[in-house]
């Protein structure tokens, strides 16, 4: 089985899952080529699992304009069984090559179907995304195959690395600093919780605004901006609570990653978490934008060790039962082998 991926993402949960899947497929004997942007920090994580070719994805770059022709020529030469595009914009560049099964993998809600004119099958990582694709009028094949993450526990980072007292309650969140991630709401929540520290991993266009908000609310001494981290697991293992504060989150890989490290989760009632989280059982859920609600939920977990343990254990059970590496990899292998 030979698969050629084209993935033009930058850094984030979708990219971490891409790395996980490429490695899992390689372990099961799939020969892979990955076309990615230059300079990706996660390139080294797939170097042993796939041949890597780099291509620019800027809208007006010559590489982007020529990419469909390059992929088609490469496909004729190397004869992959499957071409797999990750996300709508990569799907738009899918060549009209008849010799391979053409798959588009979606981790978010598409706005139109014209991206997928040369796609045979759309893989959606939640039922909600699949429903959107169907509602838009898609008549070809749809599969729902979700994500997985590594479940191995790691050694927690020393809190002193982020200038945080060893005995302080610590809350963490991570992702690109954009408005929809809701980090401003989380900072407002922490301002209501004296003594609680907040670690934010990531970066982005809202960075300066978030720094200013922390200063304006008088909590800059308790908020740590840690930037992008190659491995977030030691940080997840070191904190008391992980908070997913997004107003829009199709799945929520960060929740799965938190459960893998035994960390309880508080999440907004956004799309993905509402699918697999059960309020009060495997996590606590809060309305979008409700800083006071986040503060109450965080305080509950910090103050109640038995609740913290129970939420973490039930979360890990959900991870293993619904998002296992073996089951997700099996589902992809079954799909890849179903080439018409």
Swiss-Prot record:
What Enzyme Commission number(s) appear in the record? 2.4.-.-
| Protein family per UniProt | Belongs to the glycosyltransferase group 1 family. Glycosyltransferase 4 subfamily.
* UniProt superkingdom: Bacteria
What is the designated name of this protein? Lipopolysaccharide core biosynthesis glycosyltransferase LpsE
Q: Give any GO molecular function from the UniProt entry.
A: glycosyltransferase activity
Keywords, comma-separated and alphabetical? Glycosyltransferase, Lipopolysaccharide biosynthesis, Transferase
Q: Which GO terms describe its biological process?
A: lipopolysaccharide core region biosynthetic process
Pathway of action: Bacterial outer membrane biogenesis; LPS core biosynthesis
Which enzyme class, named as a word? transferase
Q: What lineage does UniProt assign to this protein's organism?
A: Bacteria, Pseudomonadati, Pseudomonadota, Alphaproteobacteria, Hyphomicrobiales
User: Is Glycosyltransferase among the key words of this record?
Assistant: yes
The record's InterPro entries line, in alphabetical order, gives:
Glyco_trans_1 (IPR001296), Glyco_trans_4-like_N (IPR028098)
Kindly give the Pfam families that the UniProt entry links to this protein. Glyco_transf_4, Glycos_transf_1
């Amino acid at each position: 089985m030979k698969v050629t991926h084209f993935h033009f993402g930058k850094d984030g949960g979708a990219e971490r899952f891409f790395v996980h899947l490429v490695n899992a497929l390689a372990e099961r004997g799939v020969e892979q080529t990955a076309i990615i942007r230059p300079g990706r920090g996660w390139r080294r994580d797939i170097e042993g699992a796939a041949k890597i070719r780099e291509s620019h994805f800027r809208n007006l770059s010559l590489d982007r304009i020529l990419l469909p022709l390059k992929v088609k020529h490469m496909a004729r030469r190397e004869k992959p069984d499957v071409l797999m595009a990750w996300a709508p914009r990569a799907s738009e560049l899918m060549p009209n090559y008849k010799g391979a099964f053409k798959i588009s993998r979606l981790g978010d809600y598409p706005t139109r179907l014209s991206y997928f004119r040369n796609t045979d099958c759309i893989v959606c990582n939640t039922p909600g995304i699949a429903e959107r694709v169907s509602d838009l009028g898609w008549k070809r094949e749809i599969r729902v195959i979700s994500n997985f993450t590594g479940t191995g526990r790691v050694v927690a980072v020393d809190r002193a690395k982020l200038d945080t007292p060893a005995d302080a309650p610590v809350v963490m969140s991570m992702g690109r600093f954009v408005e929809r991630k809701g980090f401003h709401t989380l900072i407002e929540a922490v301002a209501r919780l004296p003594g609680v520290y907040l670690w934010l991993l990531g970066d982005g266009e809202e960075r300066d605004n978030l720094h200013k908000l922390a200063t304006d609310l008088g909590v800059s001494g308790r908020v740590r901006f840690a930037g992008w981290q190659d491995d977030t697991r030691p940080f997840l293992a070191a904190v008391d609570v992980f908070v997913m504060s997004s107003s829009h989150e199709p799945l929520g890989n960060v929740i799965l990653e938190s459960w893998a490290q035994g960390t309880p989760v508080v999440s907004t009632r956004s799309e993905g978490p509402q699918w697999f989280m059960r309020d009060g059982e495997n996590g606590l859920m809060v309305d979008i934008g409700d800083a006071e609600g986040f503060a109450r939920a965080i305080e509950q977990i910090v103050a109640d060790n038995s609740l913290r343990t129970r939420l973490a254990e039930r979360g890990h059970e959900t991870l293993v039962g619904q998002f296992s590496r073996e089951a997700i990899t099996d589902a992809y292998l079954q799909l890849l082998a179903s080439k018409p």
